[in-house]
Amino acid sequence: MNSRERILGRVRRALVDVPRDDPSYEQAVSRDYACEHGDRSVEQTVELLAENLADYRAIVHRTDAEGLAGLIAGLLEKRGSASVLVPSGLDEGWLSQTGVTRVTDRAESTPHELDRVDSVVTACSVAIAETGTIVLDGSPDQGRRRITLVPDHHVCVVRVPEQVVSSVPQGLERLDPARPLTWISGPSATSDIELDRVEGVHGPRTLEVILVGDA
C-alpha cells in the first residue's frame, strides 16, 4: 500500500457514517452573504483601491496607456535598477523606453539568480478594492509565483476599471481555483511580538502599483 492509498483509505473511513444522500459541500454551505459592502460607482471603487493600496504602504501611480512605458522607465531609473525580470508574456511595449537589462523568467533560474535581479514588472489578474489586494494567477504576463517574491522591487500594472472589483467574493468569481494564485496586499511585511514591523522578509520590500486608465 502506497501513501496515496493510505490517505484515501483514511478519507473513506472518516466518511463511512455519512449518508449517501447527504447534500454536497456546495449545497450545504449557505452563500447568501453580501457580495460587497456599500454601493459605489466605478470611480469610487478605483479610488478605494488606491487608498487601501497606499494604506498598506504600496506606492500608487496613475497613467494612461500612452504614458505607461515612460512611467515604468522612470520608476526603474529612480530605483537605480540595472536589471529587470520579465515574464514571458509581458507586453513588450511596457519596457520600450528603458535600457535596463532584461532578465527572462526561466524555470531553471535559482533563487540566488533571482535575488540578484533588481526589479520585476508584471501585469495582474484582478485587483480588490475593499482589501487593497492584487491577485496574480501565473498567466504569461505575470509569470511564476517566485519571480514576484524574490526580487526586492515589484512594479505591478493594473488596468482600470476592467481589472478592479469591489470585494473578495467578486474577485473569486473571476479567478480559476486551479491556477497558482498569489494574493498581494502591499509590500512584504511582518511584525514580531513587540509589533516591530520589518519589510522584505517574505517578498519585495517595495511594491509599486500602476493604475492604467483611459486617456
Where are these regions (language model features)?
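The feature marks the mature, well-folded catalytic cores of soluble enzymes
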Residues: 1-215
